[in-house]
């Protein structure tokens, strides 16, 4: 990892923290404010999602009941771990929630893992193709983490209606936690409680990966003889961070859906 000699330290950091943007108003590669699509986030997340599906598909096609290979063993362990986690928290039909939990964990982990790729490698490759800015860690982009957390929020609402019905959910919102006499306060508390969930879910993942990426960029600015040692130390620690953050996102998703699915 090394910094470009033409850039100052501040410019180097700014360059690596900038996205490849598409303005959805006029479809030019400029900043369109709210109507901006971060192409780098889209490309990397879709490629990693496709890679995840392809690997699982190939291993499933070649699965054997006799002597499983290393890939089959690893995937079976991941599937059993995800199913066991869901079973401990969610007591309804797991046919949707268990695959969702597995998908979230693997996909988020793969996107987090991009933080361990040398900071100059992928941006340099795209720079050869004329792309000035390219940020290779999708989960360090709040637009992606908020998109995922909002999707979880929609699922929570879906399970609320599915398990309790419109009338049952309405009664719960109006009467809890303080009883019918304090309905306005109950509604306010419920709105705050439900609104905080997707925000905290998104910001927790984004904050940890953004900070991790920034530290790698700062390490790349150091003299070459210190980059390897500090880079290895931070990589080993960050490997734990990216795994834990993927697990937390998966676990909180399951917990939120489980709470929504509980009928009272």
UniProtKB/Swiss-Prot annotation:
Localisation: Cell inner membrane
Single GO BP term: proton motive force-driven plasma membrane ATP synthesis
The answer to whether the entry has keyword GTP-binding is no
Gene Ontology terms, MF aspect? proton-transporting ATP synthase activity, rotational mechanism
Q: Which UniProt keywords apply?
A: ATP synthesis, Cell inner membrane, Cell membrane, CF(0), Hydrogen ion transport, Ion transport, Membrane, Transmembrane, Transmembrane helix, Transport
Chief place of localization = membrane
Q: Which Gene3D superfamilies match?
A: ATP synthase, F0 complex, subunit A
* Topology versus the membrane: Multi-pass membrane protein
Q: Which Pfam families match?
A: ATP-synt_A
- The UniProt transmembrane annotation reads 39-59, 97-117, 139-159, 205-225, 239-259
InterPro entries hit by this protein: ATP_syn_F0_a_bact/chloroplast, ATP_synth_F0_asu, ATP_synth_F0_asu_AS, F0_ATP_A_sf
Q: Which domain of life is it from?
A: Bacteria
SUPFAM superfamilies reported in the protein's UniProt record? F1F0 ATP synthase subunit A
Q: What does this protein do?
A: Key component of the proton channel; it plays a direct role in the translocation of protons across the membrane.
| Subunit description | F-type ATPases have 2 components, CF(1) - the catalytic core - and CF(0) - the membrane proton channel. CF(1) has five subunits: alpha(3), beta(3), gamma(1), delta(1), epsilon(1). CF(0) has three main subunits: a(1), b(2) and c(9-12). The alpha and beta chains form an alternating ring which encloses part of the gamma chain. CF(1) is attached to CF(0) by a central stalk formed by the gamma and epsilon chains, while a peripheral stalk is formed by the delta and b chains.
Family listed: Belongs to the ATPase A chain family.
Query: What is the protein name given in its UniProt record?
Result: ATP synthase subunit a
Which taxonomic lineage is given here? Bacteria, Pseudomonadati, Pseudomonadota, Gammaproteobacteria, Legionellales
């Amino acid at each position: 990892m090394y910094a470009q000699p033409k850039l100052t330290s501040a410019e180097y950091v700014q360059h690596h923290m900038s996205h490849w943007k598409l303005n959805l108003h006029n479809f030019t590669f400029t900043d369109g404010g709210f109507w901006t699509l971060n192409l780098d986030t889209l490309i990397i997340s879709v490629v990693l999602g496709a890679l995840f599906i392809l690997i699982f598909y190939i291993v499933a096609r070649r699965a054997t009941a006799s002597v499983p290979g290393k890939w089959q063993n690893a995937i079976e362990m991941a599937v059993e771990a995800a199913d066991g986690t869901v079973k401990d928290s969610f007591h309804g039909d797991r046919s949707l929630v268990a695959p969702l939990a597995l998908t979230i964990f693997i996909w988020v982990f793969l996107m987090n893992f991009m933080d361990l790729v040398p900071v100059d490698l992928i941006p340099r490759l795209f720079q050869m193709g004329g792309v000035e800015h390219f940020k290779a860690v999708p989960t360090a982009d709040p637009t992606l983490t908020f998109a995922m957390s909002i999707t979880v929020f929609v699922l929570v609402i879906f399970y609320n209606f599915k398990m309790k019905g419109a009338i049952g959910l309405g009664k719960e919102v109006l009467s809890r936690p303080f009883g019918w006499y304090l309905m306005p306060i109950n509604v306010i508390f419920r709105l705050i409680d439900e609104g905080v969930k997707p925000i905290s879910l998104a910001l927790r993942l984004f904050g940890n990966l953004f900070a991790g990426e920034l530290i790698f960029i700062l390490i790349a600015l150091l003299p070459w003889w210190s980059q390897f040692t500090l880079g290895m130390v931070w990589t080993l620690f960050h490997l734990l961070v990216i795994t834990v953050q993927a697990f937390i996102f998966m676990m909180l998703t399951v917990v939120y859906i489980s709470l929504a699915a509980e009928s009272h």
